[in-house]
């Protein structure tokens, strides 16, 4: 049988970022279509869908800078997805509890997209050393998340994004990734 292409949505219409999220939308849309849901209903639903909290969650825009909370990016693989989802120059807040991860792949994923790496937590020196070894030197060390958000706000240019996608667990500074993400949102809103 011949396959028919049915346009449902353009990725620019979606409120969620990231190729992995767009692939999930395509899968859900295909299943809904084959279950008999109208193209119009599918389009409306996928265009209204927003990110789950702490997963590349859009927080706000201030002074032309977009802020994203990806606190659930608690390991390098998950945090890579956050970086890949950004479509602007990015100031990346990373670091936290040391789970003995390698950060090389995460740092290599910056690929010219990350302007500054702003580090907090137990892993900040370890990540800084790995980044410098790999040739990334635009690094700022901070005492805590509040300072990191403030530094990012000062360094960011209109059109940039500030992304909390730490590649580390939250323990030591926060009870869990939800608390870390909620604090990030509070600090951003207080700017």
Language model feature labels by segment:
Residues 41, 78, 126-129, 173:
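Phosphate- and divalent-cation-binding pockets in alpha/beta enzyme and binding domains
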């Amino acid at each position: 049988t011949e396959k028919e292409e049915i346009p449902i949505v353009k990725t620019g219409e979606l409120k969620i970022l990231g190729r992995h999220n767009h692939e999930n939308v395509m899968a859900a849309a295909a299943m809904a279509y084959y279950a008999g849901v109208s193209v119009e209903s599918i389009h409306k639903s996928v265009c209204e869908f927003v990110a789950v909290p702490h997963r590349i969650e859009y927080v706000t825009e201030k002074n032309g800078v977009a802020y994203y909370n990806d606190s659930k990016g608690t390991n390098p693989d998950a945090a890579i997805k956050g970086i890949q989802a950004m479509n602007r120059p990015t100031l990346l807040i990373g670091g936290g509890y040391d789970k003995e991860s390698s950060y090389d792949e995460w740092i290599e994923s910056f690929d010219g997209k990350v302007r500054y790496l702003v580090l907090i937590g137990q892993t900040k020196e370890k990540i800084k050393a790995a980044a410098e070894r790999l040739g990334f030197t635009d690094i700022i060390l901070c005492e805590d998340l509040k300072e990191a958000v403030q530094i990012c706000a000062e360094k960011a240019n209109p059109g940039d994004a500030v992304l909390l996608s730490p590649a580390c667990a939250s323990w030591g500074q926060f009870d869990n990734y939800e608390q870390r993400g909620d604090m990030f949102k509070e600090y951003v809103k207080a700017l």
